[in-house]
Amino acid sequence: MELRLYDTLTRDKRPFTPIDPANVRMYVCGPTVYDFAHIGNARPVIVFDVLFRLLRHLYGEAHVKYVRNITDVDDKINDRAARDYPGLPLNEAIRKVTEQTERQFHDDVDALGCLRPTVEPRATEHIGEMRSIIEKLVAGGFAYVEQDHVLFSPSAMNAANGVLPRYGSLANRSLDEMIAGARVDVAPYKRDATDFVLWKPSKPGEPSWPSPAGIATPGRPGWHIECSAMSWKHLGETFDIHGGGIDLVFPHHENEVAQSCCAFHTERMAQTWMHNGFLQVEGEKMSKSLGNFITIRELLATNKFGGRSWDGATLRLAMLKTHYRQPIDWTVDALHEAEKAILDWSDFAKDATPVRCDEVIAALTDDLNTPKMIAELHALRRAGKADELRGAMQLLGINPVVRAPVDLDATAKSLIEARTAARANKDWKESDRIRDELAAMGVVLKDGKDADGKSVTTWELAR
C-alpha cells in the first residue's frame, strides 16, 4: 500500500518515498528533562510511535531508524537544579535532575505503550558536532561572532545563491512577518532582529565547553543547533521525516532547516515535515494558572483528572481518536469512551491470534488516519473478527490486557479514607500523622468541598 503523508513544508498530502527504502530515517524532537512530561508532551510521543510502528510494518523492523533526542542542557534545567539541590555544585545538581527526569519520562511513555526509539541521543554528548556545524556556518558567511556569541543570519541565508531554501519557507512567513508576529529579542550583539544564537557564553558555574570560532570564553550551545547536530550525527545531512508539535514549526524547526541546509549546502533537511496539533483540556488551554495543567504521571497514578487514575492504553487510544493534525480536546468523557472500547476489545480478542487487516493498514497509510482506523476496529468487533482485531490493536500499540492502576493509587486512597475518618472523629493528631505519611510518599493532599458543599479530599504527586 502507498503511504501518503502531509508535509508541512509543501502544505499538501503526497506519497512518501524514502531516500533509501532499506534505511528509512525519522527524527522527532524529544523532551527537555527538567520536570514531569505533561499530557500535551505525550501527543507527539504517541503519534510518532504509531508512525514508527507503521514504517516498521511497511519496510521491515531492521530498515527503520527512529531518533528522538534528549535535551539535557537548558536554562530551565539549571534553574530546577539550583532550586532542588541548593547545597550541590550546579553541574552535579544538573546531573541529578536530568537523570531522574529522563527515568520518569521513560517510565511514563513506556506505560503509554510506546516503543523506545532506535537511538535516543543526549545533547551534551554531541557538543563536538555542534561546534563543527557552527564552524561551517561561520566559514560560509551564514553566521558571525559578536561579544562571545555566535549568531546565525537569516538575511545572509536568503541572500545566498544556489539550492538553499528561503528562510521562512517552513513557517510560510517572511522575515518582516516574523518580526511583527513574534517577540524577537533584539540584543546589542545582534546585527538584525531575526538573527538567532548558535552559541553563547556561559555564566560562572553553569555548564560550559570550549567555544567554536576562535572564542576564548567557554560557552554552551543555543537551543536550535542541538537538533541539527544530533540528526546529522545519527541520520545524515538529509533524511526522510522530521516530526514534532506544531508549536515547534517556528522558530525551532525553521532554524534547524536554516542551520543544516546552510552548513551542508542542501535544499532540504528532511524530505517530509510532520507536526501534530495543539491539546486543550476540557475546552480550555492547559495552564497552571487555570488549574488544569496535568502530567502523564498524574493521569496514570493519581485521581486528579476525573477523580481516578487511568490506564496507559486508555490514554493512548483517547489521544488517537483525533487526527494528529487537528487540535484535541482532552476530556474525562473521551477517556471513559476509550476505556470502554478497550475493555470490550480486550475481552473479545485477548486470546486471538493477530492477523493483518488491509482496511486498517489503508487507514493508517492515509496520513495516519487514526480516527478511521479506530472506526475499522469497531467494525471488526461488530463483525466478530477477533484475529483481525487483535492484529489491529497490536499495530496501534494497544495491549489487549488492560493494566490495573498502580499500587500508589490504592495506597493513597486507603490512607485518605483513614484520614477522613480521623477528621470526622476530630482526631486531628491522627489526621496530621496520615498527612505526613502521604507527604513522605510524595503525595500532596488538597481538602475542599464538592458542588453540594460536602467535604472532599483529592491528591496529586508532588513535583
Swiss-Prot record:
ATP binds at K288. The keyword Cytoplasm applies. InterPro entries: Cys-tRNA-ligase (IPR015803), Cys-tRNA-synt_Ia_DALR (IPR015273), Cys-tRNA/MSH_ligase (IPR024909), CysS_C (IPR056411), Rossmann-like_a/b/a_fold (IPR014729), tRNA-synt_1_cat_dom (IPR032678), tRNAsynth_Ia_anticodon-bd (IPR009080). It comes from the Bacteria. GO terms for molecular function: ATP binding; cysteine-tRNA ligase activity; zinc ion binding. One of its GO terms (cellular component) is cytosol. Zn(2+) binds at C29, C227, H252, E256. It catalyses: tRNA(Cys) + L-cysteine + ATP = L-cysteinyl-tRNA(Cys) + AMP + diphosphate. It is found in: Cytoplasm. SMART domains: DALR_2. Pfam families: CysS_C, tRNA-synt_1e. A motif ('HIGH' region) lies at residues 31-41. Its EC number is 6.1.1.16. Binds 1 zinc ion per subunit. A motif ('KMSKS' region) lies at residues 285-289. The keyword Metal-binding applies. PANTHER family: CYSTEINE--TRNA LIGASE, CYTOPLASMIC (PTHR10890:SF3), CYSTEINYL-TRNA SYNTHETASE (PTHR10890). Monomer. HAMAP family: Cys_tRNA_synth. Belongs to the class-I aminoacyl-tRNA synthetase family. This is Cysteine--tRNA ligase. It comes from Rhodopseudomonas palustris (strain ATCC BAA-98 / CGA009).
